């Protein structure tokens, strides 16, 4: 086992981070969370008293903060970003400042301060629209948006810095789905499930675009697995992380079927043509990583969370919708 004890999770209070952090603590890592907490300050409440957790409220663009918090860190799992195309396009200057401009010094400071391993959450949308049945990690990137373009550029920045003592790994996740303490209801499966349960109708925009998905429990298990891998196995590696590839129309049909075949589905036109079907063959062969959780499980998890009141006011509370929060706080 690699001798890695302290993990810094940027964006650790976000949708993925708030599921990942408790798993790392369960594995007895010391965990430091760096986050702005703009989506809520209580998402890590169940583990707040854990002596191995340190929460730092701050901005990854603050270099002095990074210089103060990174020393003593063995691993950085970098999740923090303006995390989808609509939120990025709301203020492209802001998006670039967080997603790309801040990334360069983050990597430099990490390397200079002896961080052993840097795991970067990129996106599978870097591929753009592909006609191939299976999009592999070696295919050229053809991003359709600045959000995806700068995600790809960050990959280049990180992999250039990799050395024997600074292990760099890139994950290109599919769209994540399922329940989280920091719930998002602006992701494909989650959107359709929310509207089916709480609005009584599913509206599909377009429908034929392919959207790969991965359950939030699987993507967070993957990040834990990467900490346990020998350095040589993941050095300078790029991995797609996906389980199920479906069209949006098919996802809507899965939602309807899972909830009892009672929800009408309406089809609306769209000009969002992002479509991709990614292969997870490499990560399965090299790391023996097999996702275990299905879209149906994500739907049922969300249904249970709605029933238990864990996602109050799902149609109106802006905290579940990244772009609405960004608009409300006027982040600069």
Predicted regions and their residues:
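Conserved Rossmann-fold NAD(P)-dependent oxidoreductase catalytic core, especially the SDR/UDP-sugar
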Residues: 104-146
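SDR active-site strand-loop-helix element
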Residues: 10, 34, 76-79, 118-123, ...
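NAD(P)H-binding glycine-rich loop region in Rossmannoid oxidoreductase-like domains
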Residues: 60-98
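C-terminal substrate-binding subdomain of Rossmann-fold SDR/epimerase-dehydratase oxidoreductases
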Residues: 200, 205-208, 212-332
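Glycine-rich NAD(P)-binding loop of the Rossmann-fold in SDR/ketoreductase-type enzymes
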Residues: 61, 94-105, 141, 145, ...
